[in-house]
Amino acid sequence: MQDWRAALEEYYSRYLDSALVLAIVNDSDDSNTAREILEALSIESQCDSHEEHWDNLRRDEQELLNLKTLDEEINKIDEEDFTWELKDSSLELDPDVYNFLRSMFSDLSAARVQLVQAKCQNDLVRSSDELLNHRAIQESEQIETAADALITSNIGHRSRQRKKKTKKATNSRKPLSKFQSNTEEVNEDPILKPSLSVWENNRLLIEKLTSILNIPSSQINHEFYKNSSAWPITIRNLIHRHQPLSNITNNELMKYQEEATQLAKDTGLSLKICTDVLICSNDYKNALWILCLIKETQHNEMGNIKLSSQTAKSNSSTQTKTCLNDQSSKLVEDDEALSAEDCNRLAEEYLELRNMQYSNSAKEYRRSKSNHLFGGSAMYHAQLGREYHEKALKYRSLAMRSLAHSGTSHSLDLHGATVREAKTIVRERVAAWWAKEADTSPNSIRPFVIVTGRGNHSIGLEARLLPAIVRLLQQDHWRFDAEHGQITVYGINRHSKLNSNA
């Protein structure tokens, strides 16, 4: 029952989404019903693609016409020349760059533009960034000044009453360590803001971790919800798979020991997790922020969680997914040394992994309707499914290549090949065989034997390879005999070739 489903999936996946084809094939009881549905959908998708193509062409032509019209209007406008302001300037400035900056930032003074351009050594991009920052600072200062004016005008009489002096607690004169001073800065801005919802807090934390660790937010989303929304375990797993940890040398590791020791002493976390966080963040303050997040969420959400090498086991479904992913990572690296059977087996395993990831993506997408954070997890699973699909195609291609080089110079076994693959292989092998035998006498030619099988593994137990190869050899004007799942090629059928030319 699986053979016709696999054949339909392989054929219609070229025109439709593979997940949709898989769902229709699995829901159908017989091949005819599934084929009718898929054929109708494929025809409809092809018609839609053609209409969409023509719509895109019309839209592109209209946009091009609009751009041409806009360019003509812009070219008619005379640009103002500011280069006369450089006559009395002692700075060596590029007139073209200055003219562009002056026209773009007309609200700024000429002296300010000249100083910024000289500071940036006539670099247009750097100068533009500097002037944009200056404009933003000016606007923020104006907003703060207006706000202060409103607040000052509303101050009451009681605010000017004399306050009693209170003695401040005398602090010890012991100098603050680097960690203590940075801890105060982190504590001023709480990691989990009580005024925000849980969803907003998690979104802000994911954005912060993305900027620090340079990890895609979809991957952090997936890891966070895979570990039951526990930040300590999530951060540990992300740090464990982070790229810099695998490239660190012993000399570089020694540089982080002093700061990591201080972090471990003051946070109470293990030296290993402090060192790993410091290496991955590559900044003391960022590492401190991540460790404070671990400490705070460990206390508030998870209790006394210890970040050790042995974490709590996930549920049985998570274990199954992990085992399959580990199995895919341990697949044979030497692709060229694999046989056709091994390549087909690996292709089937990758297809199973692809289907599992597409199923997980669909589940996460349905969950994202109630919680938007699951949208990133759905995208992550869909990306994994596409990667597994590409690997399955790769090993399928390797299987065809291995099959093409199998057998002897005068024989070929096509078991395990599809009709399309078999046609390509037969043409190559028969041409190579005839290149060697063409110069010999007709009585000395050694025939070429092609084994196609009797169709015992085909849908409906009907042979597919044999009729397809027979039609191919007839079209290419070969002389052959076909019987009992085997084709024997003797040479070129010259009479058939002459008749076709006539």
Curated annotation (Swiss-Prot):
Single biological process term from Gene Ontology: nuclear-transcribed mRNA catabolic process, no-go decay
Lineage: Eukaryota, Fungi, Dikarya, Ascomycota, Taphrinomycotina
Record's compositionally biased regions (Basic residues): 157-171
Smr domain sequence ranges: 411-459
Keyword terms: Nucleus
Keyword rRNA-binding belongs to the record: no
Coiled coil regions in record: none
Cell compartments where the protein resides: Nucleus, Nucleolus
Key word Nucleus present: yes
PROSITE patterns in UniProt: SMR
InterPro entries, A to Z: Endo/PolyKinase_Domain-Protein, Smr_dom, Smr_dom_sf
Residue ranges, annotated region (Disordered): 150-184
Domain of life: Eukaryota
Matches recorded under PANTHER family: NEDD4-BINDING PROTEIN 2
Protein name as it appears in the record: Smr domain-containing protein C1235.03
One annotated GO molecular function: endonuclease activity
Gene Ontology cellular component annotations, sorted alphabetically: cytoplasm; nucleolus; nucleus
Organism whose genome encodes this protein: Schizosaccharomyces pombe (strain 972 / ATCC 24843)
Predominant localisation class: nucleus
